[in-house]
Amino acid sequence: MRIVFAGTPDFAVPSLRSVTQRADVVAVYTQPDRPAGRGRELMPSPVKLEAVARGLPVYQPQTLRSPEMLEQLRVLRPDLIVVVAYGVILPEAVLAIPDDGCWNVHASLLPRWRGAAPIQRAIEAGDTETGVCLMQMEAGLDTGPVLMSLKTPINAHETSGQLHDRLAEMGAQLLSDGLGLLRAGLRPVPQPQLAAGVTYAHKLGKVEARLDWEQPAERLACRVRAFQPWPVAEVVLSGERVRIHEALALDLDHSQPPGKVLAASKEGIDVACVQGALRLCRLQREGGKAITAADYLNARRDLQVRA
């Protein structure tokens, strides 16, 4: 089976490894090298690094819509194109090239959380369950029929980074299972997505990281987890803007205004929210590294409040 693999970030690497064990990967498509780091040097994508290490041909077009790119894909004669977090929309002309179409591994239980940030939005919304889907691609954004899926609970204190790593491995396993069926002549049966329950996971932005104490503590705790490791939640704490790497929601009755420090100890800094309180456990001052609440309080003697 001849497969073209298209993917870019870390999430796609386990799937690429999985495909190489099941089929002949004739080409890997990934986004062009991007400037990164303080020196703004061009850096290859994680998928490119993996593909090069495996001796696979790598292509990095700016677009797949040009006649030259379409002809290049046709010459490769793929039976199937596998897409995992590629970051480039495949035009219908590309979708029509492989005999078996194009498959996509998506990090949610479709139709919930179509779009660019399904992992973060699931945690932000307080979802207790998510999963991965293997989808037959069509022209719409994550609208294609679902071939297979795997479910998993979202753990109470799980961050987006932690869930990302679990779902990446689950997606690779799901893809391997699907390819195994296809090779055996047992094509997975496409199940159309239901119109009910569609939600969209729009791309994360840095401005979202700024938390507002005028929200319930439970929602803020979910956002702290959702925005870890990027863009990392930010709050104003007694006049200082700090980043929050870990926090807990407290079901606490109080009559204090939102943003008021209620208690501060080595366990954490409890801040009043419009409903409940948020305990800040790991913080980061501007220009510093993430530290415990105890270490932060050593530098902020003005916050030495006791419960």
Curated annotation (Swiss-Prot):
**Binding-site list for (6S)-5,6,7,8-tetrahydrofolate:** S108, L109, L110, P111
Is this entry keyworded Cell membrane?
no
Q: Which UniProt keywords apply?
A: Protein biosynthesis, Transferase
**Sorted alphabetically, which Gene3D superfamilies does this protein's record hold?**
Formyl transferase, C-terminal domain, Formyl transferase, N-terminal domain
Q: What is this protein called?
A: Methionyl-tRNA formyltransferase
Instruction: Give the enzyme's main class according to its UniProt record, as a single word.
Output: transferase
* Any one GO molecular-function label of the UniProt entry: methionyl-tRNA formyltransferase activity
Q: Give the similarity note.
A: Belongs to the Fmt family.
Do you know which InterPro entries this protein is assigned to? Fmt, Formyl_trans_C, Formyl_trans_C_sf, Formyl_transf_N, Formyl_transf_N_sf, Formyl_transferase-like_C_sf, GART_AS, Met-tRNA-FMT_C
Q: What high-level taxonomic lineage is stated for the organism?
A: Bacteria, Pseudomonadati, Pseudomonadota, Gammaproteobacteria, Lysobacterales
Catalytic activity annotated for this protein?
Answer: L-methionyl-tRNA(fMet) + (6R)-10-formyltetrahydrofolate = N-formyl-L-methionyl-tRNA(fMet) + (6S)-5,6,7,8-tetrahydrofolate + H(+)
Which Pfam families does the annotation name? Answer: Formyl_trans_C, Formyl_trans_N
